[in-house]
């Protein structure tokens, strides 16, 4: 849908999909936030990883995890939706020390 582009205020990768499509954790970690308190991100999951990275999964229709829960890579953590936006999508972000990092630069090629 849209690639990382800080000039356009796109701080991650936006993937198109259908309401209810599964959202999977990118790597092992601990859920540090799973709620809808940040309006622009809708239902949001934040996962902290041992290497200092935090991954964010925004605009979900349903959250399958809770704060404090440990997750493994590939585990279903949410379902895609359109909360906080006008179309169904997953906005996937990676942050290091609070700053956005291009997800393509840290994820393995598939």
Residue ranges and their predicted role:
Residues 1-41:
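Surface-exposed, glycine-biased beta-strand/turn segments
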Residues 3, 34-35, 63, 80-83:
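Residue-level recognition of beta-strand microenvironments
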Residues 3-6, 43-55:
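Short, basic/aromatic beta-hairpin or loop at an interaction surface
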Residues 12-16, 44-49, 91-93:
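Short, acidic/hydrophobic/Gly-rich beta-strand patch recurrent on exposed beta strands
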Residues 19-21, 51-54, 99:
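Short acidic/polar mixed-charge low-complexity motifs
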Residues 22-31, 65-79:
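Short, well-structured beta-strand-loop connectors
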Residues 34, 50-74:
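Short histidine-centered loop motifs in beta-beta connectors
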Residues 69-110:
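Conserved, short, structured surface segments that act as functional micro-motifs
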């Amino acid at each position: 849908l849209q690639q990382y582009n800080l000039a356009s205020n796109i701080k991650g990768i936006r993937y198109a999909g259908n309401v209810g499509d599964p959202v999977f954790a990118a790597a092992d970690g601990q859920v540090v936030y799973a709620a809808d308190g940040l309006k622009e991100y809708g239902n949001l999951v934040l996962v902290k990883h041992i290497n200092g990275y935090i991954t964010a999964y925004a605009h979900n229709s349903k959250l399958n995890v809770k704060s404090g829960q440990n997750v493994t890579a590939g585990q279903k953590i949410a379902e895609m939706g359109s909360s906080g936006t006008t179309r169904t999508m997953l906005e996937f972000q990676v942050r290091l020390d609070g700053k956005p990092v291009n997800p393509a630069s840290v994820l393995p090629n598939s």
